[in-house]
Amino acid sequence: MKNPFSDNPQIEVVSSFSELINSNFQADMNAMCWHRNLAGDFKEIVAKLELKENITEVSIEDLLALQLSEKGNLAREIILKDIQQLTDFGASPSLNLLKCYERDEELDFISTDVYSFHIDRSPIETDTFLCTYYGAASDIVANDQVEQKILIPEIREQLKKLYDGPEAEFETFLEEYFFDLH
């Protein structure tokens, strides 16, 4: 299988679930991809699920209740196996059907929604697994190809105008409102 990320040194491609969960980030790498050519009709599953909100959580029971073709059933089995493997690993997987994420339109000079390239932060080391079965996957940008918006002088000045507190706590304000992640 050709590595679709060979031009992106920040993405490590693995060939199995075991390799995915047992690999560590190092150097410039900031993402791992378990690239698979999945059999089955994931589009059929999406078409038969009911979108209740912009983001609808899909339970195992919801999946099992679907009347599917043979190819749809293959897709369902892959999803169920992935959920089980993640659960056995100690993760808390959730399956979501997405229409769209909410947009952050509060400020016209900086956005903090998921449509803005961003990083994730956790006070403890944690694993986040994103899996796209149908539709466009998330984009990724190398760390050395981006600049934090809070370091752009014009944006930083706007944020300082928005902030109403002591200068010594400005960085805390940026973290508290997630401006530092974009």
Where do the language-model regions lie?
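Extracellular-facing segments of soluble proteins and assemblies that are Gly/Ser/Thr-biased and enriched
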Residues: 70-115, 120
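Residue-level signature for short turns and capping positions that connect secondary-structure elements
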Residues: 39, 100, 145-146
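Short acidic, gly/pro-rich beta-turn/loop elements at beta-sheet edges
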Residues: 42-44, 105, 142
